[in-house]
Design a protein with these regions (language model features):
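Signature of extracytoplasmic/envelope-associated structural regions
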Residues: 1-138
Length: 138
């Protein structure tokens, strides 16, 4: 059955504990995104190049498994000075620190340690994909 991209929703919430379900929900965790793509099962297989007495290929063992998602976000402000935009959580999961200057502005600066991670719920036209401990690139 065909899935319609217009029936997709992405919810993102910063993890309190890495790799655990942060349970994103509602409009507060929804992202306005475009150019959505998802690969629900990527794997890095480990080859077994064993020498055998007969012809044939060697089996591969499934190694690291992971999900990969991609999307574009519009960089628009929240509309209120000193209030983080909706996409700020996604930027924090991409290795940026958020600094809120009350009633003035919100700044984002790259960091090299203490990266945050996010929990992403991707509703793909009735199919729910959950990603725990997600980190990205911007």
């Amino acid at each position: 059955m065909t899935r319609l991209i217009r029936n997709s929703v992405i919810l993102l919430k910063i993890d309190a504990v890495y790799g655990e379900d942060a349970a994103p929900s509602g409009a507060g965790d929804a992202l306005l995104a475009s150019n959505l793509s998802i690969n629900p099962l990527n794997a890095q297989n480990q080859s077994r190049d064993v020498i055998r007495q007969f012809l044939g290929n060697s089996e591969q063992l499934v190694g690291t498994r992971y999900k990969e998602v991609g999307f574009d976000l519009e960089l628009v402000g929240s509309g209120t000075p000193g209030t983080p935009p909706a996409w700020g959580k996604a930027l924090r999961a991409c290795g940026f620190a958020e600094t809120i200057l009350a009633t003035t502005r919100v700044d984002y600066t790259p960091i090299s340690t203490s990266f945050e991670s996010a929990c992403i719920y991707w509703y793909d036209d009735g199919v729910l994909h959950k990603l725990f401990g997600a980190r990205g690139t911007a």
